[in-house]
Amino acid sequence: MLVDSQNRSTLFYDQRALGAVTDKGYYRVDSPFGNGSTLGITQPQFWNDGNLRWLQLDTNKYGLPGADLLEDNAGSMIRTSRNVGIQSGYLDVFDSAGNLIWSAASASKMPRVVGFFDVPANYDLQNNTFAVNLSFNPWILVNNCPGNLSDDGTVVGYSGIVLKWTGSQLQGRYITKNQRNWSQTLQGRGLRIPIAQFVGI
């Protein structure tokens, strides 16, 4: 069977448990989920390296993932990449140049986006907690999570989406200090953070 398409998914690259953080409690990133005393900076191998990063939080863990601020042993991270080769097999899909971009043999290594942490336009995420009910522990696309931490030695600033997994809800809140607020950034258009499952990993 030959199907023409231009879309190529990323494929599973690796999965690693998030370990201890550094500088725990140094940046008191205050939110409805905690005063920041348990948050620290993740190890460099979990920072943005050009791949897609998918975070799965353990129950009752939280953090500011877009700024690489999480709790100790917060969960796991999967990286997916376009540089992983697709294995030819049943139901191969090719692009217009004849490149293999999907196959049933490799489908289990692709993230299956099954929903979104979908904050609607004009929702006041800075003064309200947004929650999504889920029957599974989601993998959250960190690349779509706004987050920034600044420190010039005198003034500390931060902003972004703080996320918490309760075991049945993914909860989020926009926080800011000495940086732009929600209404100045994304409130007018909203925000969609993909939520995925991985099958066969």
Ranges and model annotations:
Residues 41, 45-56:
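The feature marks the first
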Residues 52-54, 60-65, 146-156, 181-183:
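Short, surface-exposed beta-strand/loop "edge" segments at domain boundaries and coil↔beta transitions
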Residues 144-180:
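C-terminal structured domain segments
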